[in-house]
């Protein structure tokens, strides 16, 4: 897996980060803490740890990492077509390009942080 500075990555836990530096001793440094679940105690890791980290996708284009069910700018993604992502959360269709993306909440993060209220029927 060839990840370059400026590439975005997505882990199997749903974390998204951008590679900001590859140090002289071949440590990969990201702008977000994506290693916590893998037991790596710092923000940098060697390329041989990529599988342990659980990186499942990488791309220079952030839109390539977004999946149906994720939330972009607070709206649930219903479809992805080429460079467009489609939502329909406010009774009208909305399409986003990569340049319009401000925030991403992956479906994995949503599920991990969601509290379900159980009701007795």
Language-model segment annotations:
Residues 1-121:
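Structural boundary micro-motifs
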